Amino acid sequence: MHDEAVFNAIAGEEKRQREGLELIPSENYVSRAVREALGSVMTNKYSEGYPGARYYGGQTYTDVVEDLARERAKQLFNCQFVNVQPLSGAPANLELYAALLNPGDTVLGMDLSHGGHLTHGHPVTLPAKIYNFVRYKMKNPDTGEIDYDEMREVAKREKPKIVLAGFSAYSRELDYDAFVSIAREVGAFAVFDIAHIAGLIAGKAIRNPFDAGFDVMTTTTHKTLRGPRGGMILTREDADIAKKIDKSVFPGLQGGPHMNVIAAKAVAFGEALTPAFGTYAMQILKNAKAMEVVFAKEKVRMLGGGTSNHLILADVFGSLGVTGAEAEKVLDEVGITLNKNSIADDTRKPMDPSGIRFGTPAVTTRNFKEAECTRVAELMIHTLKHKDEEKVKLDVRAEIKALAEKFPIPESFV
């Protein structure tokens, strides 16, 4: 059967990706090899359990790919235990909580409005209905510095079982040692949700939290890691913690793992083990810095004062008088995709906030360097300053399309 409606939608999305530039920090392009594994016959197989201990027969090759994924992840992140079965980042976090906490236990995580993630305790989420979340914030949103003194006082007062690092809209590097120190002081697990920066860690562009003593890390396998959409939980060295996590994932919260996705994870982790991936990770940072320079020159306020990672959060409403939703829409019209985003202590509503969030993982995959990212940043600001001028938008759209044609999405990275 040829499903023309679905085929046309896929073809349209392929054209959109090919002719435009992707600046959403959590998005990236995967290789043809990853896509082939994702679309392979592994999708047909049920594999409840773990390698060597399955509840169904016929597991010879599924065990091979899961073992490959686990061993490659251990090499990438320098740890002893890995579970590659989580379906994505949010399930991985819930499974981590279920493994280490009892209902009502406390977690200390980053406030959503200061860069945290929904799964770090926002009241609308399931974890917040089961566990007690308390929050830390930035001392000064213009520098991005976390108030570690206040964080320590909150930890001493609230006695969390988990001290949680990690973010979805924070552009600076956290003080790993401070997190671990605070966790140790109150007898908590030190956990890092590295979903956004996993590829930067794997590529050795930034420090590995395990080297600072974190106990567990959760992550997605897409974003900067450039794999399929999925999740993973990594344990530094404690076998008892790893055993609890395995039981929490299966049978605790999941049934049969998606073996096609695990096969694709194994391929992506193999790609990330190559020297080329380290070069890629470093270039992500260089490209983000190049964009920071342009926004600073144009006096557009950036949360944290700039970036130390792959993303930038810009206050376009305060600096340019354009709301985040307006900016997202007009930039989409010229072929630049990013997302509207609330900023620290934003007075506007989440669907029409003051900020935009953008980053460099996907354009770096297309082999953009500093010069190209500088030009894209200039075009972004030019478009926002002239958002009601059709000729400006047409000219920018033509230049973006030409850039996309000059730097096509690669089929292979190694």
Where do the protein language model's features map onto the residues?
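N-terminal glycine-rich, Lys/His-bearing helix-loop that initiates the first secondary-structure elements
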Residues: 1-68, 181, 404-405, 409-414
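A non-catalytic, amphipathic alpha-helix used as a structural packing/dimerization or gating element
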Residues: 12, 64, 68, 154, ...
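Flexible, glycine/charged-enriched surface loops at secondary-structure junctions
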Residues: 20, 52, 81, 256-259, ...
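A glycine-rich phosphate-binding loop feature that marks nucleotide/adenosyl-phosphate handling sites
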Residues: 266, 283-289, 305-313, 344-349, ...
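Short acidic (Asp/Glu) and glycine-rich catalytic loops that position anionic groups and cofactors
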Residues: 13-19, 45-51, 160, 242-247, ...
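PLP-dependent enzyme catalytic core of the Aspartate aminotransferase-like
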Residues: 2-4, 286-287, 350-414
